[in-house]
Structures are given as structure tokens and as C-alpha cells.
Amino acid sequence: MRHLLIFFALLAACGATSLTAVAQDSAIATRPQRLLYVAAPGIRNYLEYGGHGLVVFDMNNGHKFVKRIPTGGLGSDGKPLNVKGVCASATTMRLYISTIETLQCIDLTTETLLWEKALEGGCDRMSIAPDGSVLYVPSFEKARWNIVNGDTGDVIAKITPDSGAHNTVYGLDGKWCYLAGLRSPLLTIADTSTHTASRTVGPFSSSIRPFTINGRQTLCFVTINELLGFEVGDIVTGKKLHRVKVTGFQPGPVKRHGCPSHGIGLTPDEKELWVTDGHNQHLHIFDATVMPPTQMTSIKVRDEPGWITFSIDGQYAYPSTGDVIDAASKQIVTTLTDETGAAVMSEKMVEVQFENDRIVRTGDQFGIGRVLTADGIPKSKTAP
């Protein structure tokens, strides 16, 4: 009898182990394919930081190099131009790359360039509507934003804040688009139903550089010239709320951008705010659950960071240095390298998720907050 009990116990254990293995295999099989698309040259036109093209990494497999997709964006001399922005749509399954002169549209299912158009005034860092129908494309540090049809690339409207057009963020609900110029202390808010400037936030203490917003579009967090840190604005009232300086570090000369902090991002759950520090080659992390946010810790990275964004689920932080950081532990888990083993660094990258060869979800080149309701559930740009 005792031998029978032992036999059945072993049989049950083996069955449980098998079921666990099957469940694990099933979970892996049903997990979306997560790819990180990195547009290069994404630090000025420096080819030593990743060459030219769309460099793809497997987020589910240690961020290993997958492939390089050829892109356009060549100048009259045949050399690659500075990439200024990247965005993608799960609905249309298209990815867009802006350079200082042109806007490119790539079909991600065929990995072919559908069109490339030179927009009047050039291009800077754009943003795409949640349904992929429209892009707000800033001219290259000039007066206006071109509103572009996502299908054809045709300009359908223009907004002219005359602010030195530079950075653009679409709200998650698609109703508002946020326009920042590098020669203005005001953040312009566009009504996307009419493609007109509706109101502003600020003035902030100096011209706005990279910025971000929370999911409910009640707060903006802006970096500005001459500040190692950031300021906070109330999108509802239009007023500046707080000025927050990084402590324990001193600003100094930087190789690019001309400002101490050129990069800021909210984690998708909006619990943390990450700010770049070029001179000291650090990321500074703040507790965003309190106002004003309070400084928590800092992370040393391998080069001067000029941007920061996050994976859709908030698992990874992606500074422009190519360091891949586990956002929870604050540890660098790997670095991006291309097919030759060379380091890849870029300020222009976006996550795209696939299921059954179809795009189901896209991230954002900006580290935007994704909490839409009091339940604290983040949202991504998901195909219908």
C-alpha cells in the first residue's frame, strides 16, 4: 500500500511539473513580440552611433539585434541627414521618421518606404494621432507646425505659434496636441478637431526644451534652458506650478543641445519622473506621486544622455545612450549593439508589439504618462 501511495505521489508530481512547463510554454507563445525600433543617425548626423537605417532589437530576448531596415533621409550630398523624430501607428501599421528636411512613411508589414516628402521649412520631432490619421510635424526650429495626412503625406493645415517649432506630443485621447518651441517659454495646446491653437501653459522661466505630460492631461513637466532639473505646469489653469532643481550635482558644459537637462519622461504608471543630466552623464529619478516631485536616486550612464523614454509596460527605461535599464531595480541590464557589435545610441526610438504578424500596440518616443483614470491603469496606443 505504501509503495502505491509513493507511486501515485510521484505520478502527480510529474503531472504537475508537466502542466507547469506547458503553462510556461503557452505563456511564452502568447506573449506579444516586442520590438524596439531605433532610428539612426539619431544623435545629430553622427554615423558612429549606429550608422543609418532603422535598427531593430528584440525586447523579449535580451534586446539582441534583429535586423536593420533601410531608410531614406539622404541629403543632396547623398549622406544621411539628422533624424529628428520617430512614431508609429498600430491602426495603419506604419512608422514615420522625420529628418531636418523630410518626412518618411514606412510600411512595417513589408518594411518598405511608401513615400518620403520634403515639407516646407523642414521637419523636427513630430507626433501622431492615436488613430494614425494625422501627424503634427514641426518645421525645423521655425515658425509653424505642418499638420500632415498620415496616409498621403499631404499638408492639410498649419499652426504658427512662431516659437521655434521643435517638440510635439499628442494626448492619449487624441483631442489635444502639445507644441513646444525652443525659443518660447509657452507650451501651445492645439485643438485637433479644428487644427488651431487653443491655449497655452506658462510662461515658464525660460524656453522649453523636451517635455512630457500625464495621461489625464492635467500636468506638464518641462525642461528649460539653463536649468538642471525641470518645471511643472498646470494644463487646466495654464499656470506654472513648481520649479525643481537636481541636488547633489552641478551643471557644466555639454556636448549637445546647449542645456543641462535635455530629456524628461514619466514612467507609464506616473509614479516616477526621470530627468537627464548631460554634463554629469546621469539620469536623475524623482518621486512623481507627490508635488512637487522629490529626488530619489541617480543612475550613471555611458555617455551624455539627451533623451529618455520607456517601454509600454514600464519594465525598461531607454536613455539615448543605448543603456537598457530595468526601471524597477534601476540597474543597467544590457546595452544596444548593432550587427557589427558597435554601440547604438539614439534619441529616436519607439516600441512596436506584434501578435500573429499584426501590430497590436505602439509606444512613444516621449516618456509620457499613461494613467487615464483613478484606477491607475496605464494605456498604450492599441489597434482597434
Give the ranges of each region predicted by the language model.
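Bacterial N-terminal signal peptides
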Residues: 6-18
